Curated annotation (Swiss-Prot):
It comes from Shewanella oneidensis (strain ATCC 700550 / JCM 31522 / CIP 106686 / LMG 19005 / NCIMB 14063 / MR-1). The lineage of its organism: Bacteria, Pseudomonadati, Pseudomonadota, Gammaproteobacteria, Alteromonadales. GO terms for biological process: translation. CDD domains: RPS2. The keyword Amino-acid biosynthesis does not apply. The keyword DNA damage does not apply. PROSITE patterns: RIBOSOMAL_S2_1, RIBOSOMAL_S2_2. GO terms for cellular component: cytosolic small ribosomal subunit. Belongs to the universal ribosomal protein uS2 family. PANTHER family: 30S RIBOSOMAL PROTEIN S2 PROKARYOTIC AND ORGANELLAR, SMALL RIBOSOMAL SUBUNIT PROTEIN US2M. SUPFAM superfamilies: Ribosomal protein S2. This is Small ribosomal subunit protein uS2.
C-alpha cells in the first residue's frame, strides 16, 4: 500500500502554510502555530489524512474507477499532467471550463470534435484545405487539446477528483459536489476545506510538495489497478506458477 511518512512531508515543505494575515479560520484545527509570520501546518494531522486519501484512491482504482487529477495553477500543471499519464488516468492542467462535469453532454461533443480534428490532421485532410482553413483548424485543434486533451479518453464522469489547491479549483469542487463525486484536495491555510471529502492540509504552492502529492496519488492509483489486474488474472485462471 502506498503511504507517505512525516519525513517525506518535512523534506518537501508540506508544513509551510501562507502568511498568517491571509489565513482562513476554517483551517484552524490543522494549524500547529506560526513562525516568522507564516502558519505552520500540523503534520500530525496531514500524514494520516493523506494516507487515508491514498487508500481511498487505491480502492477506487482497484474497481476500475476513474481518477481525475485537477491542478490549473502554474506551479501544479506539469506535475498533474505527468502523474495522471503515469497511472493511465485523466487530468485538467490548463483551465477548468465551467460545466466540465455538470454539463458533460456538451463537453462530450467538444471531445468528439477534438478527435475528428486529430484524425483529419494525420489522414491528409488538412493538406487538401486552403492555407487559411488549415490554419484555422490547426488552431481549433490546439485550443481543444489544451482544454480537453487530458479527459478526451475518460469516456464519462470520473469516480474521484484529486485537486491541488482547493481555493483555486473551487468551481471543479462545486461541480463534483453537485454530482456526488468524492473530492480529495490539498487545502492550504488560506483556503476553506468546504466540499472536500478527504482534506489534505498542506502547502499547495511549493514544487517539491506538489510533486510529493501527485507522485503518491499516481502510485496509489497504479497499486489499485495492479490489484484489479491480479484479481482479473486469477478469475481468468492465469495465475503464475510459483
Amino acid at each position: 500500500m502506498t503511504t507517505v511518512s512525516m519525513r517525506d512531508m518535512l523534506q518537501a515543505g508540506v508544513h509551510f502554510g501562507h502568511q498568517t494575515r491571509y489565513w482562513n479560520p476554517k483551517m484552524k484545527p490543522f494549524i500547529f502555530g506560526a513562525r516568522n509570520g507564516v502558519h505552520i501546518i500540523n503534520l500530525e494531522h496531514t500524514v494520516p489524512m493523506f494516507n487515508e486519501a491514498l487508500a481511498f484512491i487505491s480502492n477506487v482504482a482497484s474497481k476500475k474507477g476513474k481518477v481525475l487529477f485537477v491542478g490549473t495553477k502554474r506551479a501544479a500543471g506539469e506535475a498533474i499532467k505527468e502523474a495522471a499519464i503515469s497511472c493511465d488516468q485523466y487530468y485538467v492542467d490548463h483551465r477548468w471550463l465551467g460545466g466540465m462535469l455538470t454539463n458533460w453532454k456538451t463537453v462530450r461533443q467538444s471531445i468528439k470534435r477534438l478527435k475528428e480534428l486529430e484524425s483529419q490532421s494525420v489522414d491528409g485532410t488538412f493538406d487538401k484545405l486552403t492555407k487559411k482553413e488549415a490554419l484555422m483548424r490547426t488552431r481549433e485543434l490546439e485550443k481543444l487539446e489544451k482544454s480537453l486533451g487530458g479527459i478526451k479518453n475518460m469516456g464519462g464522469l470520473p469516480d474521484v477528483l484529486f485537486v491541488i489547491g482547493a481555493d483555486h479549483e473551487h468551481i471543479a469542487i462545486k461541480e463534483a459536489n453537485n454530482l456526488g463525486i468524492p473530492v480529495v484536495a490539498v487545502v492550504d491555510t488560506n483556503s476553506a476545506p468546504d466540499g472536500v471529502n478527504y482534506i489534505v492540509p498542506g502547502n499547495d504552492d511549493a514544487m517539491r510538495a506538489i510533486r510529493l502529492y501527485t507522485t503518491s496519488v499516481a502510485a496509489a492509483a497504479n497499486a489499485g489497478r495492479g490489484q484489479d489486474l491480479a484479481v482479473q488474472a486469477e478469475q481468468d485462471g492465469f495465475v503464475e506458477a510459483e
